[in-house]
UniProtKB/Swiss-Prot annotation:
Pfam families, per database record: AlaDh_PNT_C, AlaDh_PNT_N
GO biological process: alanine catabolic process; ornithine metabolic process
Function per UniProt: Catalyzes the NADPH-dependent reductive condensation between pyruvic acid and the side chain amino group of L-ornithine to form N(5)-(L-1-carboxyethyl)-L-ornithine. To a lesser extent, can also use L-lysine as substrate (yielding N(6)-(L-1-carboxyethyl)-L-lysine). NADH cannot replace NADPH in the condensation reaction.
Organism (species): Lactococcus lactis subsp. lactis
Domain of life from the UniProt record: Bacteria
Protein name: N(5)-(carboxyethyl)ornithine synthase
Subunit structure: Homotetramer.
Sections of the chain in a coiled coil: none
GO MF entry, a single one: alanine dehydrogenase activity
Further details from the record: No enzyme activity is detectable in the reverse direction with NADP(+) and chemically synthesized N(5)-(L-1-carboxyethyl)-L-ornithine as potential substrates.
Sequence positions that bind pyruvate: 15, 71, 92
Record Gene3D superfamilies: NAD(P)-binding Rossmann-like Domain (3.40.50.720)
Length: 313
């Protein structure tokens, strides 16, 4: 199968998900956009030496049966997408990718292979199929999201925590673990809350100086911090949403970017950057390339089409 890799044009994105050193025994033909590895100083020739075809962005879209885009494909590229094409990457169908699914995936009958760490699935014509991709495959990327996001938020806010700084972390998954690993180097005054202990957090949330969210709630779930609860927070409270569940877990919050990571509202400060692993792209690219090579690129990606064949007749 012909798989095209395009440079992510998502704001601030620098990760390179496939490195030449990991290209070996691929069952797919790889088409790479010119300058794909520039953030890691990788020349096009290094990809060409591994058997990849180097093309312009438009040519990659036109000639590929599947497009791999690490982050959500942006509206500027919508016109490139053609009916029945496969899209592989983090598409967040129920989150930031809802408009993409509605405006592109459904009308163009795209086969969307979403690489969600907890539940990688295939989305096609309003149906969801098992992808066969192992769950938790990209857990290190989630860990780095929490780790790097917390560091960046603290520096952008202008504060290194001390033992006097009261810190709450919501969640127990990979993102929350990364957040704890990062912030615990500066303070031990940290309380972690899980879904089962959220009632205790609700009793104490106004005491905290920093609240770090590592939970992504369901589309029909109530927010963990409602509008009214946010009003009760101390002036200057920093809310770091490293799960980047904008508008959901923290009601009314909105995405920020690496270039403008924090906004203030009613004396509270919000950090909701959706691609924090890109802050440490040199580390993350190494991890991603190895895992994606073994589990996505090396195996014939036409296997994903087989999964949706009952509807694709």
């Amino acid at each position: 199968m012909k798989i095209g890799l395009v440079k992510a044009n998502f704001p601030g994105e620098r990760r390179v998900p496939l490195l030449p050193k990991d290209i070996k025994d691929f069952k797919n033909e790889i088409l790479v956009e010119e300058g794909f590895g520039k953030f890691l100083d990788i020349d096009d020739q290094e990809y060409s030496d591994k058997g990849c075809h180097i093309l312009s962005r438009a040519e990659v879209f036109a000639e590929s049966e599947a497009i791999f885009s690490l982050k959500l494909i942006q509206p500027t590229d919508y016109y490139h997408l053609r009916e029945g094409q496969m899209i592989i990457g983090w598409t967040h169908p129920f989150g930031s990718g809802q408009s993409f699914m509605k405006e592109q995936a459904l009308p163009k009958k795209l086969i969307v292979v979403d690489l969600d760490s907890n539940s990688p699935c295939i989305y096609y014509e309003n149906e969801i199929f098992e992808s066969g991709i192992p769950k938790g495959l990209l857990y290190k990327n989630s860990f780095y999201a929490g780790y790097a996001g917390v560091l960046d938020a603290l520096l952008q806010y202008g504060l290194i925590p001390t033992e006097e700084t009261k810190i709450a972390i919501l969640g127990s998954g990979n993102v929350a673990q990364g957040a704890f690993s990062s912030i615990s180097k500066y303070s031990s005054n940290i309380r972690m809350y899980y879904r089962k202990t959220m009632s205790i957090f609700k009793e104490n949330y106004t005491k905290y100086d920093i609240i770090i969210n590592g939970i992504e709630i369901g589309k029909d779930d109530d927010p963990i911090l409602s509008f009214s609860e946010q009003k009760s927070l101390k002036k200057g409270t920093l809310i770091i949403d490293v799960a980047a569940d904008a508008g959901n877990t923290i009601e009314g919050s909105h995405f920020t970017s690496i270039d403008a990571p924090i906004y203030e509202n009613a004396g509270k400060y919000y950090y909701v950057v959706p691609n924090t692993p890109s802050l440490i792209y040199r580390n993350v690219s190494q991890e991603l390339s190895k895992i994606l090579s073994e589990n996505i690129f090396r195996k014939d990606c036409s296997r994903f089409i087989e999964k949706v064949k009952p509807l694709n007749k």
